[in-house]
Amino acid sequence: MELEFPEDLRYLDSHEYIRLDGEIATIGISAYAIEQLGDLVFLELPEVGDSLERGSSFGSIESVKAAEDLYPPVSGTVIDRNEAMIETPEVIADDPYGDGWLLKVRVENPDDELEDTLSAHDYRAMLEGEEGI
């Protein structure tokens, strides 16, 4: 299966992605992470109004194979969470970069927050180095 890495996104080495539109960030997990986890069975996300701090876990995702913490690429306040994905996490795999988003966050300092993220090209290169995808 050919994995997609949309060019308009930024990625973390822990496999979360961010799409920034002004001061609003959409956060999700990459197709690679979903492929590695397998069938998703549980998703825990923060509540609307909660604060996120870049580098600190904001929730977890579990599959039949593993459980992983989720990390925000940015700091900010949760303004929306994808309730449908909490109810049926297995459908995240159907469209991870579209309907499978996890959170929307109002970012405190959009220009400063993305410096530790990877471009699609760099993310793919990292994965090729690790896994030979």
Curated annotation (Swiss-Prot):
Cellular component terms per the entry's GO annotation: cytosol; glycine cleavage complex
GO biological process terms on file: glycine decarboxylation via glycine cleavage system
CDD domains: GCS_H (cd06848)
Record PTM N6-lipoyllysine, positions in chain: 65
Signal peptide: none
Disulphide-bonded residues: none
Domain Lipoyl-binding per the UniProt entry, residue ranges: 24-106
Cofactor section: (R)-lipoate
Record's keyword terms, sorted: Lipoyl
Record carries keyword Aminoacyl-tRNA synthetase: no
Cofactor comment: Binds 1 lipoyl cofactor covalently.
Family in the record: Belongs to the GcvH family.
Subunit (UniProt): The glycine cleavage system is composed of four proteins: P, T, L and H.
Cross-referenced HAMAP family: GcvH
Role according to the record: The glycine cleavage system catalyzes the degradation of glycine. The H protein shuttles the methylamine group of glycine from the P protein to the T protein.
Name the record gives this protein: Glycine cleavage system H protein
Source organism (scientific name): Crocosphaera subtropica (strain ATCC 51142 / BH68) (Cyanothece sp. (strain ATCC 51142))
Taxonomic lineage: Bacteria, Bacillati, Cyanobacteriota, Cyanophyceae, Oscillatoriophycideae
Gene name for this UniProt entry: gcvH
